[in-house]
């Protein structure tokens, strides 16, 4: 299949989709012709609108049809071998080939979409689980989706997890830049001796030597060649030579680097190389033709036919409404980019930016200088190397010492000398036989003859004797036997012929002649016998030849690395390589550094071609910045009120009740009716009178409450400083490669950095008007730079991205354009940015265009702009109850609720040891209700003035018939309050009273934790009546409303406590009430801009107990409180010696809270406390003498008694519970301590208030007009200007503030009580509040401790009647020590007592004077090691660790970024990836690790590659699964695409913790506590595993924080596909740890089915804990 055909096939589905969209749009269009009876609304055509936002990128157009093949040309001459050609055109169809092998079965298709939900069934009973049914038939596979466009390249990833230091040996770093040349290192160790060099070339022959002494004339011998002798043994080393003269050279200077050497000889053949895998071979020959295939399936519908001839022009129809925005048009013809502007001047340096992310990997640096020499470490022995070349001859050695060697063997006989001159005539003495004369003198040496040929090597001689003392030269031996004749010599020079003399005898050996010059190098002699071995250390033999390679030795110890060699000289430039094939496309590069901003370019050439049609009015532009404030205008005219008749109003409120009618006759009693439906909950009745019952038993811990709504977002942070500009990289080499095939148009790339300014090119031919490109990415806003020098006037630049600037000047009139055909209806565009409140300036009127040709009727237009809001209607009547909807999105935070119920009272703790007397505390809260007192006795009571005791309650009588209503009597005067009777039974509920005056709303409570969205529950039965809440603080009286209808009878409230008050007088007529009932709850508004911090509110009611906060800083010292209870007197210690007071030092740093001190002695009597708050009671009569009471609280301590005698030492008591941290003590006397370490950096302070305005500056010189600046921030609102013209219809505004609170709904069923939270750490001490109003009288409290003596002006009661004499009381407890007595007389000196227990150490004395230095003692022996010291005091806080490396990931399961838990540090935010599925196999992420938090979201975040160097993206039926949010599914259940996916994907945060983090699971509905020494990070539900498509999935490690999700959902994740869609599917299951009762552990689990609303009752709870550091 050729490349063109494959493009056709790829684009065919896109064409069909477009065709389908077109037909759908046409069907929707409705009335588009002239038959619509609409009125003619043609008004005056408005002015030309602002330029709209750029449209979306168009789709890829259809490919053109393939042209016909041309005729075949004549063959040309044979040309040179050309470059490899482009792929040829598609050949003609060959004969059918043989049928191929059957293919592998295809991958399974994507599951089809779920059907719409059926009608709801009747809820059935919970049936038991049925048996597994037979497998159903497999469903039909769905259609495969279209491949999505390739995604944009991802940003460069962040550095990986820090898991501690990696040793440098394991990971090799990138090569660095060249270092500075190092200083020369010390001289290295001498190298090993090199091998012997090769023998030198043979030298030239030396000059002839002086003539030798004449030899004897030899016999003329025969010459024949003797046999070749054996090689002799190597001879003994010769005697040492004469010592040479040593010359000393001075040490040279540093060598300079030599010139480049000549090219060396070619090296030995290298080891075989390891090659890379070769490129794929050329295509093979075409295969055999295949057989005919089966008949093809029915083809796809054809392309639309050619358009028909145009119809007749119809009558002009009415103007249609503005249609929806059309789909993106096809890409326009791109006109070349304009020339780049000149490079701008270098700007002033910016302020240093914050520390950026780690930059991309740098380029390798130049090689550094050689390092210092390493220590030698022996390496392992290598394999034997190849034999090296023979070395050069070594230098001459030092002279050896001379020892005489043994005499050598006789040399070969020399050549015969010339014949000597004739001798003197002999002396005959007349005798014929002459006597031999004396030997003659040695003749002069003859002329040397020509050298003879070198003789053959003689036979091996006998081994010589070793000569021990060889001083005497031996005599010459006798002549040897005659040798064989030598070869014929060259003829000698002819001598003068003499007379032949008689041969003389041998002469005496002459003196040795001088040393001759060296002769020619002889042939090597035969190997001699081994000589005697004589060894002298000073003699050094000649270096032998290199041996053969030995066997590899044992590996040696590792040597230290050698010094680096000096850098080599640069080699010659290599020859250019062959042209390579084009490589695979590389991965996308990292994002480059942003370039500096270029200058504004010159204006482009004028456009070319006729002008286009006048476009629709554009969207309203971005509002301009606010203008400078105008002066306040004059007061306007009063507006005219045009009444508009509204729709009929809702039914009015009932009128006031009429006067009461006359009393009717009494009717007969009716038959009792059926019980009615449970009525609505009545209002809380008046509190009854009676004592409260005893407190009930402590309830079971309830479930934790839902999390409250999120708080208001914080103020936006400040912008960071700009980063430093990066280093510009080096220019790369130009690449070489063949041109590739033309690719499909790619998606728009990320805008590149601006290039440097090029030279201005020649203006090109004007191009056609291009389509508007896609909007660029929004850049990051930089900090404002320092003011630049005034530049020259720049030409207008391209429109920038960002807030709009001020309105530009009107443009010139363009040439008229042809009118284009109407476009297709587009998809709905993205919502625009919300505009500011002010309308923009009115635009200039555009020039009149030429009339265009009448176009065909267009598709329906965009919807019109939103009209102004109508006059609000009256509230409608209440509608029927609608179908239960799906859970809505979480609402904005509601008004703060009333304070919750008070928690259960805790058990009493053990009494702690009494501490020292503290400063008076603030006034405490109201105490708990006390237990009811014992019943009082009524003896000796004056019955005349007292109300009698109430009798026992009689049996309840039958309910009589209702009597007639009596007329109302006058109110009686209030009686004297009677004595309290015993508590009566609660009375029957009274009728519901008139509603009281509504109080002011209570102070807002703290926001509760955010609740998770519950599933849709079945309607529950009406809940029981809730417990009445605590009365709120008394509100200021409201204005009286109209009298309401009589309420239903309420249930009896709890009996109230208090004295009945007097009846008040009738109040005055109130003023009219505020406007009527609030309207319905408004839509959720957008989050407004955070306001300035408000003034502190009133003191709120107590909130519920929060999670434990970190301990606050100690508050300031409070006002003096009421006196505390005194401690038990301590045991008196021995008195220490008084120290002399030291000088007062500066106040030291605040210490840690100390442990409890030893109880002090009893304090002095305190001052009388403030009078208690309350009404004075009536004086009671004297009561009977009570029975002996329980031991009371200790009374106030008296003055210190006389010291008692010292008691025996008691046993150590059990340690008391840890007390609260004490208040800071008063400053002690201390010497100046050392300066402490710097504390950790504090939290950043609030931004300061703006400073005062500075004085006005000097007027500056008028600058040249600058370039257009970036839009500024919105200015402050100006003074109101004069009334402007009416503005255009604005963009939809930001959502309004929340409406007036709606009417109070019915009280919901009571929630499950939450667990009692752990006791919080003490908070910061608050500011003392204002004095509150008089509260409702509280319940009677527990008997308090004895109060301080009251003021003396209380009226003393009348004395009671004397009681009868009582029996003597029991012996009282030992009294407290009495008040201090008078000073006694000094007693006699007592007998000395036994020695006491040693006292505590006294205070340290002052430092003594320095004594004189003693003599130095002898050095002692070393002592034994001492015992371990005590643990030191806690050190200052350490510096924050950088390499904690404990990472924990937290998932919000909402669209908000989660906060890192307290004590951890944020690293980054991302999207919560649960697992991926590729090729039908799933791989999951641990939700507690950083791998589950991807920085970027994609429905297909991975691609797959094969062994053929091919990777595919979004081309297969793969899935990704992400944690989801509570966003409900759309009602259509259609897959979610595009930006609509964003609200469904959970966000996450990767945090760095200072210690290990783990999860603990309770397997109950209780939240498990963290182990000892661990603190809580968050609580949640125990999430174990999950499955989805193909029953594949993954799971969580239960020790990982990922197994503890903070919110429980039955479907906690969403499935996404490569085609860009996400949805929830019925085959997705989540698995959670269940709750297990201890008694059910080993029993068979009971099957059960839980419906919505009860799901959390069986899911285990968990907590994520971090080890405390």
From Swiss-Prot:
UniProt GO BP: basement membrane organization; blood vessel morphogenesis; brain development; branching involved in blood vessel morphogenesis; cellular response to amino acid stimulus; collagen-activated tyrosine kinase receptor signaling pathway; epithelial cell differentiation; neuromuscular junction development
Biased composition (Basic and acidic residues): 250-263, 289-298, 535-545
Tissue: Highly expressed in placenta.
GO molecular function: extracellular matrix structural constituent; extracellular matrix structural constituent conferring tensile strength; platelet-derived growth factor binding
Pfam annotation, one family: C4
Keyword Endoplasmic reticulum attributed: no
Cross-link S-Lysyl-methionine sulfilimine (Met-Lys) (interchain with K-1651) residue location(s): 1533
Cross-link (S-Lysyl-methionine sulfilimine (Lys-Met) (interchain with M-1533)): 1651
Effect of residue 538 to G: In ICH; the mutant protein is retained intracellularly and is not secreted normally
Cysteine disulfide partners in this protein: 1460-1551, 1493-1548, 1505-1511, 1570-1665, 1604-1662, 1616-1622
Signal peptide: 1-27
Primary subcellular site in the record, as a coarse category: secreted
Record's compositionally biased regions (Gly residues): 586-595, 621-630, 797-817, 1011-1020, 1290-1299
Family from the record: Belongs to the type IV collagen family.
Subunit text: There are six type IV collagen isoforms, alpha 1(IV)-alpha 6(IV), each of which can form a triple helix structure with 2 other chains to generate type IV collagen network. Interacts with EFEMP2.
Protein name in the entry: Collagen alpha-1(IV) chain
Native species: Homo sapiens (Human)
Protein's gene: COL4A1
